[in-house]
């Protein structure tokens, strides 16, 4: 945080765009910054609830809270503490890696890369959402505020549930996973299961074949990207978000009577890996 405040941030947009930004105001305590109009959460899903509690000193009676974190269940964590009319959810399609303090490499997809919207519509969430959309757009990020965020949120959950555990288990980038017929088949099986669960819930989402065709294009846009779960499993040895991805799809599948055998198995494998980092050979 001190490095960013004093020297700014160096951004590399893969493969060869470079930017330097100054003027960041940073703090390690929400108690030091006053009451905010909006608070955006961009933690790991496993860290969100602690982050919500830690942010309490800067959250006033009109503050809008926005989770841009991948995975199912982030809305429930917000609603545990704040009313739906002040809460928004969303997600992005921008893979990132922090190479060093103040240095970030991103692997964005083409088109819209950030989507967000209200859990329950209110004039305040609409006003904040449209302002946030403008800030993103002015900064060069193609972002869209949407009244109905669920189709896009589920699309990202299914995509991450496909890419994250499969590539982590195979220890491959998304491009190398996609290029291998067996890896691609595993991606596709999760997508088909996730789409079936979403449709059973009444989510207006594209058909599985269309989803897979679109996913193949995105894998080839950023083939070198190593997703965060693969980083956690292979390099950092950290707890993963598996329970909010394939684990959550499996749970929803049981509720709605949709079989999810691939999601079930991937959840077990990643859970076993992260439970035994210190014993691996």
Predicted regions located by residue number:
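Helix-loop-beta segment of a Rossmann-like dinucleotide-binding subdomain
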Residues: 59, 103-118, 168-178, 226-234
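Short, hinge-like loop/turn segments at secondary-structure boundaries
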Residues: 9-14, 83-84, 104-108, 161-163, ...
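Rossmann-fold dinucleotide-binding core
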Residues: 34, 70-156
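Active-site-proximal catalytic alpha-helix in oxidoreductases
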Residues: 150-178, 182-195, 223
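Glycine-rich phosphate-binding loop and adjoining beta1-alpha1-beta2 segment
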Residues: 1-19
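NAD(P)-dependent Rossmann-like dehydrogenase/reductase catalytic/cofactor-binding core
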Residues: 184-281
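Rossmann-like NAD(P)(H) cofactor-binding subdomain of soluble oxidoreductases
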Residues: 18-104
């Amino acid at each position: 945080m001190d490095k960013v405040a004093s020297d700014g941030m160096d951004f590399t947009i893969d493969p060869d765009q470079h930017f330097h930004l100054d003027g960041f105001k940073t703090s390690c305590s929400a108690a030091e910054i006053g009451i905010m109009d909006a608070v955006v959460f961009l933690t790991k899903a496993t860290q969100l609830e602690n982050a919500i509690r830690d942010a309490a000193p800067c959250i006033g009676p009109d503050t809008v809270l926005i989770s841009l974190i991948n995975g199912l269940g982030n809305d429930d964590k917000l609603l545990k503490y704040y009313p739906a009319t002040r809460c928004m959810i969303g997600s992005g399609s921008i893979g990132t890696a922090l190479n060093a303090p103040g240095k970030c490499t991103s692997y964005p997809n083409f088109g819209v890369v950030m989507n967000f919207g209200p859990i329950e519509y209110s004039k305040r969430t609409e006003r904040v959402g449209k302002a946030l959309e403008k800030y993103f757009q002015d900064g060069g990020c193609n972002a869209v505020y949407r009244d109905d965020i669920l189709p896009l949120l589920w699309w990202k959950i299914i995509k991450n549930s496909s890419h994250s555990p499969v590539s982590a288990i195979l220890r491959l980038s998304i491009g190398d996973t996609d290029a291998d017929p067996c890896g691609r088949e595993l991606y596709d099986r999760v997508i088909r299961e996730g789409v079936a669960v979403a449709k059973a819930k009444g989510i207006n989402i594209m058909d599985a074949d269309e989803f897979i065709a679109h996913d193949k294009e995105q894998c080839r846009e950023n083939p070198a990207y190593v997703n965060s779960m693969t980083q956690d499993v292979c390099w950092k040895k950290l707890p993963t978000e598996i329970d909010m991805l394939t684990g959550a799809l499996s749970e929803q599948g049981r509720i709605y009577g949709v079989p999810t055998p691939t999601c079930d198995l991937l959840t077990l494998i990643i859970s076993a890996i992260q439970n035994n980092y210190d014993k691996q050979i």
